[in-house]
Amino acid sequence: PVFSYSGTTISFSVVWKGRSYLLKCSLREEQENTLSWRRVAAYLQRIRSAFLVGYYYLSGEMLVFNDRGAAGYIDVVLMEYPDHMQPLDEFLEKACMEGDKERIRKLLTEFCQMAVWLINDNLVHGAIRASNVMIDKDCSVHLVNYEYMQMPRSDAPDYESIRDADNVMVANLALGIKAVASDPAAFRYLRGNAIFRFPVVRSPLLPMFADVAREAGCEPVLRIVEMLSCSNHTLHGRLALSEALRKLSGDRTELGVDLSVK
């Protein structure tokens, strides 16, 4: 397609200097959105994390016409979107169909390392889901789409209330990746579950995961399940979650139960 849209944002696929990007603009010129995009782009230029992609704010870059024929220049964002990467769910579907446990285990390590960095850096992505987690050929993990991102800001009165916004999502996704690393056939069942489809929702499978983790002696999974079971859309206890994810990144415990029969 020539373009796609989500909410009030429209995106065009472009190639610039041999690299693939998404060029994004807002359907509504709102000063608050423009300022937010500018701040995010400036902040990401400073931190340069391997878990993020290039994100550039370009002022007055695109000439647009309204339905009356009047023209004007608007600001846009240029976000790197390498065509050799795959969204998390597509990557997992292929790896699970091939039964490639080693690649899934490597992905789990990379994903947990990304999640630990995100939590400890006090950065809030704001929209973590499978389609916004891109996987490279070497299993490295890259977050994309930063329109809802919040930077660490001590002067923002609402920052404390949103700083834990990503925790439920990264915990659910880590749990799902760990499950299919043990049983790749389980992905066909878990893909439609909240764990992958809408990871902000508490999955009804958590009690089953607790039993599996307890039986296998997998302490990181059990700890994450306990934290998710006590959460209500927001999982507090950032340091505890970061530590559990750090341990999970190197955990090789087989969950030992065929999840496809549950």
In which residue ranges do the predicted regions lie?
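Helical subdomain adjoining the active site within ATP-dependent kinase catalytic cores
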Residues: 172, 178-261
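Conserved structural core of kinase catalytic domains
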Residues: 53-106
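Catalytic-loop of the protein kinase fold
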Residues: 115-136
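Protein kinase glycine-rich loop
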Residues: 2-6
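ATP-binding glycine-rich loop module of kinase domains
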Residues: 7-58, 262
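Activation of the activation-loop gatekeeper triad in protein kinase-fold domains
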Residues: 145-150
